[in-house]
Amino acid sequence: MTPSLGLIFWQSVIFLISFIILSKFAWNPINKLLEKREKYIIDSINNAEKAKEYLKNIKLKKKNILKNTEKMKYFIINEAFKKKEQIEKEAKKKAKLESYLIINKTQLLIENKKKIAIEKIKNEILNMSIIISEKILNKELEINEKNNNYFFNKKLLIIMKFSYKIFIKRYAKGFFFLVFNSKKEIFIKNEIEKFFSYKKELYKKNYFKFKYTFFKKKRKDNFF
């Protein structure tokens, strides 16, 4: 069915009237709303772009911060290790110095104690050697005295026998024998004097021998 001309006419009139009404009352607000919406969309897109750039910048900053923090971390760790090594070295040096000082002190104390002990031992040895040498020399002197007394008694007996013979001859044979035997008497006196001088020399020799042995032992002790 084809529409009639009247219907088309009235429909077009209604459309025009509605278009005029809409354009006059509704078109501008709709356009404004659309413009606002478009502007909002454009602004939101721009803001999104800005946000993207801002996020990129933040990411870059984050990366830089992380890099810097890594560098700082390694730097701090290295510094901490260096300080630790320095502290350990200083502590080792201090410990070495303290141990060296303690060792030196102990060595000095040991040496002093050793010297004191050696001096005591030397003095004891010296005293013992003096006592022993005195005993030995006393024994030697006693032996020498015994030998000398024996020798002296023997010689006295010989001299007495000889003088007794001279005495008998002097009074038996007269004045001639007296003059002749006076020389023998002088000989006997000389022999007696020689004997006593010999005995003195023996005592002197023993005395010097004692001194020599004593000082020799003393030198040996001082050498040790």
Curated annotation (Swiss-Prot):
Major localization listed first in the record, in broad terms: membrane
A single cellular component GO annotation: plasma membrane
TM stretches of this protein: 2-22
Keywords: ATP synthesis, Cell membrane, CF(0), Hydrogen ion transport, Ion transport, Membrane, Transmembrane, Transmembrane helix, Transport
Membrane topology: Single-pass membrane protein
Domain of life: Bacteria
InterPro entries named among the record's database cross-references: ATP_synth_b/b'su_bac/chlpt (IPR002146), ATP_synth_F0_bsu_bac (IPR005864), ATP_synthase_B_chain (IPR050059)
Molecular function via GO: proton-transporting ATP synthase activity, rotational mechanism; proton-transporting ATPase activity, rotational mechanism
Record's signal peptide: none
Entry's localization field: Cell membrane
Pfam families: ATP-synt_B
Subunit structure: F-type ATPases have 2 components, F(1) - the catalytic core - and F(0) - the membrane proton channel. F(1) has five subunits: alpha(3), beta(3), gamma(1), delta(1), epsilon(1). F(0) has three main subunits: a(1), b(2) and c(10-14). The alpha and beta chains form an alternating ring which encloses part of the gamma chain. F(1) is attached to F(0) by a central stalk formed by the gamma and epsilon chains, while a peripheral stalk is formed by the delta and b chains.
Protein family (similarity comment): Belongs to the ATPase B chain family.
Protein purpose: F(1)F(0) ATP synthase produces ATP from ADP in the presence of a proton or sodium gradient. F-type ATPases consist of two structural domains, F(1) containing the extramembraneous catalytic core and F(0) containing the membrane proton channel, linked together by a central stalk and a peripheral stalk. During catalysis, ATP synthesis in the catalytic domain of F(1) is coupled via a rotary mechanism of the central stalk subunits to proton translocation.
Protein name as it appears in the record: ATP synthase subunit b
Organism: Karelsulcia muelleri (strain GWSS)
